[in-house]
């Protein structure tokens, strides 16, 4: 339904952010979290990172995809492109390259911006490309992740452990998935403008992969019930 209609992607944006980072970055590089990661927008999902924190790009990508950290998204954008505006240019270039021509990205995390939008079909194209990357699938299917963060600027706590839980309720086990189907990986999203969103890759019992996308669901529980129904239908 309405696969070409303009929608707000919210944090499903991070699928593209992760894909670009995997293509352009070195997973073992140590990245320093910039001041721009100190996001104070109410309700903003965070990975509990502070400016000056140091962690590898690989760890940052878990911080991006597991707890949906907007702070991690900013840090990745600065590492790859120097700032988030330049990173957004890379996002739009990549989207165009994949044929996602009815999208425009203005930031790496998906916080509300009138100039930041996509369509279900474009999001399918982007996610379909992302799941060709084994590292992407590995990161985006992880229910929980912990890592050690270092910060030389923090005299009281130069080293600490951060732990993240995936917001995808199918991965956390909060909701059961369709019979004879297994969740491959996915990304959630939510803002008032975008509603509740979920982009999901799943594997059927016969090994076939499917992609299911729901955007702008008004109710959290309804999103997961609808997604389970959608995934069940793909086998009929």
Task: Name each model-derived stretch.
Residues 1-121, 130-131:
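Active-site-adjacent loops and short helices of periplasmic peptidoglycan-processing enzymes
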Residues 83-236:
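Penicillin-recognizing serine hydrolase domain
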């Amino acid at each position: 339904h309405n696969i070409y209609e303009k929608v707000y992607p919210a944090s499903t944006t991070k699928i593209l952010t992760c894909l670009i980072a995997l293509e352009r970055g070195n997973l073992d590089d140590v990245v320093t979290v910039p001041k721009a990661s100190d996001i104070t927008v109410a309700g903003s999902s965070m990975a509990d990172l502070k400016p000056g924190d140091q962690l590898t790009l690989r760890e940052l990508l878990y911080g991006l995809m597991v707890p949906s950290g907007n702070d991690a998204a900013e840090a990745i954008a600065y590492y790859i492109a120097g700032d988030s505006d330049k990173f957004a240019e890379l996002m739009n270039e990549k989207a165009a390259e994949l044929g996602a021509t009815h999208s425009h990205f203005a930031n790496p995390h998906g916080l509300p911006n009138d100039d930041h939008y996509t369509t279900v079909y474009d999001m399918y194209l982007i996610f379909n490309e992302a799941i060709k990357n084994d590292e992407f699938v590995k990161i985006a299917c992880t229910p929980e992740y912990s890592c050690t963060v270092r910060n030389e600027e923090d005299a009281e706590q130069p080293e600490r452990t951060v732990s993240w839980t995936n917001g995808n309720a199918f991965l956390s086990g909060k909701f059961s998935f369709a019979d004879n189907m297994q969740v491959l990986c996915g990304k959630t999203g939510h803002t008032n403008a975008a509603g509740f969103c979920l982009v999901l890759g799943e594997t059927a019992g016969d090994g076939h992969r499917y992609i299911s996308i729901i955007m702008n669901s008004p109710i959290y529980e309804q999103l997961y019930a609808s997604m389970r129904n959608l995934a069940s239908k793909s086998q009929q």
